[in-house]
């Protein structure tokens, strides 16, 4: 998996998400208005979705391409379809 994605980019994004979630946790204790907490939750979810997109892009560009060139195309496509379905259902 490491070879098919920009790990540095992903780690940077994930650190940002960790910071967002920690901030949301603090907001709960600080009596921040619900609307503001919900806005931050939305931002964290969007950032996670972006991470999924980065992983999906790397998977297509490297793993799928390599698998189609050197493997069983039907199996590769079926596995990819399942991954896309799972990713699409995360929202």
List the predicted regions and their residue ranges.
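Solvent-exposed interaction patches of small proteins and small membrane subunits
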Residues: 1-91
């Amino acid at each position: 998996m490491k070879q098919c994605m920009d790990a540095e980019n992903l780690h940077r994004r994930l650190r940002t998400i960790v910071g967002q979630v920690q901030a949301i946790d603090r907001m709960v204790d600080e009596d921040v208005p619900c609307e503001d907490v919900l806005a931050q939750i939305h931002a964290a979810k969007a950032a996670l979705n972006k991470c999924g997109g980065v992983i999906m892009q790397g998977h297509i560009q490297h793993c799928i391409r390599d698998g189609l060139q050197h493997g069983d195309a039907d199996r590769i496509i079926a596995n990819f379809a399942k991954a896309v379905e799972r990713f699409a259902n995360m929202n």
